[in-house]
């Protein structure tokens, strides 16, 4: 066997490895996109639930206008957010506003006993659980993707083909705000 054939064989093997690595990165990137779309579906359902929740609360706690306005503003910001980082930050604000809205039920026993409010609160809780599961799946997909672009041989050409690190969907610094127990004044 001549040296030319050996060199050609090595080049073919390297090209095949490169194609395989590239295709793996494409698949991982698509998985991240699908996972974010799954989060988006859950968030849209939550956004669609909020007007009904506000209308129900408004009937019992009309003078809590500030809290209701905060929820509406946070919902609008969340609906217009783009990209995982921006969406996560906006959704954190919305979660905090919703926590304060739900806490109003403690100050209004008639609201707390309202069947429609209870149903909406249950639906919201279910959606929060689905969002948390979707977020975990998304973050797992991002972790696999980010690891994939840093591993050899993909690390050699990932940047050249536009594969860059992706952001996690993380509660981050505003996590404490979301987890804070709202104070209800009587």
Give residue ranges: language-model regions.
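A helix-centric hydrophobic-segment signal that preferentially recognizes long
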Residues: 2-186
